[in-house]
Amino acid sequence: KTNPEVLYSQAHKALLNQDFDNSIKMYEALTARYPFAPESRQARLDLIYAYYRGREAESAIDAADTFIRENPTHPRIDYAWYIKGLVDFARTPNSLERLFNVDLSERPPTTARKSFAAFRTVVEQFPKSDYAHDSRRRMVYLRNRLASYELSVARYYIKREAYVAAAQR
């Protein structure tokens, strides 16, 4: 039987060694066995990052949402918002789309909107955060991506002579 300090230390070491699968298992075990231990709250925050780096996007989003909901006054809540934004940002164009120069303006920007919203939360609610500057930079990129999509949709409507729909874009 391990205590929460030892389990957290092992999980954190695995995370630092980029062994995301093992760190995820240990962080999950820690939060399940010792939900009220002081290490558990930090483990939940680290788990968001481990899911993100372990390419478990949905788990990362769920963990971030849960952390934000359960810890609204935590001093590092900006980090949870930032990682949440990064998860959706990473899904915005994937490497194959970049390689083959896929026109992103023709793809629905659902994840781009979610990412923009998370980064905006960091910038607006935590302007002095370590993550605010990077969030602002990513917002500029996402704003341009969203604008390109809207222009693409407007062009489509113009081709179809649906001028009212185009004007609404």
State the predicted function of each range.
Residues K1-R169:
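Acidic, polar-rich low-complexity tracts and alpha-helical solenoid repeat scaffolds
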